[in-house]
Amino acid sequence: MKLSNEQYDVAKNVVTVVVPAAIALITGLGALYQFDTTAITGTIALLATFAGTVLGVSSRNYQKEQEAQNNEVE
């Protein structure tokens, strides 16, 4: 599956900005309302780590593809 530049940028923003903010929010609310947030924040963090890894592989493959195309042009 290929992502457009816009899709990649949105996914990267979600993984690097939105998810950490959501984890902080959930953790803070858990402290205020005295409920355990370990399972949910751990799950979200694991999913974000997986998504970040997939995005990293996607980015690396894109870079290799671009380099190959640039070498063909030269």
UniProtKB/Swiss-Prot annotation:
Q: Which domain of life is it from?
A: Viruses
Q: List keywords of the entry alphabetically.
A: Cytolysis, Host cell inner membrane, Host cell lysis by virus, Host cell membrane, Host membrane, Membrane, Transmembrane, Transmembrane helix, Viral release from host cell
Enumerate the Gene Ontology biological process terms.
Answer: killing of cells of another organism
Chief location bin: host cell
Recorded hits in Pfam families, A to Z, give: Phage_holin_Dp1 (PF16938)
Q: Name one GO cellular component term.
A: membrane
Query: Does the UniProt entry include the keyword Transmembrane helix?
Result: yes
Which InterPro entries does the record associate with it? Phage_holin_Dp1
Q: What does this protein do?
A: Accumulates harmlessly in the cytoplasmic membrane until it reaches a critical concentration that triggers the formation of micron-scale pores (holes) causing host cell membrane disruption and endolysin escape into the periplasmic space. Determines the precise timing of host cell lysis. Participates with the endolysin protein in the sequential events which lead to the programmed host cell lysis releasing the mature viral particles from the host cell.
Question: What protein is this chain from?
Answer: Holin
| Species this protein is from | Pneumococcus phage Dp-1
